Amino acid sequence: MAGKKMTVMDFKKYKEEGRKFAFVTAYDYTMASIVNDSDVEIILVGDSLGMCMLGYSTTVGVTLDDMIHHIRPVVKGAPDKFIVGDMPFGSYQESPEQAIRSASRILMETNCDCVKLEGGAVMAPTIK
């Protein structure tokens, strides 16, 4: 699948057909460009970059600016991949309005394909 960027509809079709796809994490241009030449369909720029790239002991200190700074080069390095940008702790829990502001910033400033947040059923009202 290298060379053809997947879409949400492609993933929906995969699900309907019971097909699997690969999802990896990358934090910079070099990592992303290597993945771009593979058959991996999705790259996550996760808040785990706090521990892997910034030396933090947890993800809690990762800021929205940190995420944007790392998502941007991944998008540039992997133009053929579906890029997911993680929303860091504290950027969406306060209110649905805060979540929309944060998600909008990530999407507009990085051109990633979607954002991800954590929280399960508790976050359902925010996602709606």
Residue ranges and their predicted role:
Residues 2-128:
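Alpha/beta enzyme core
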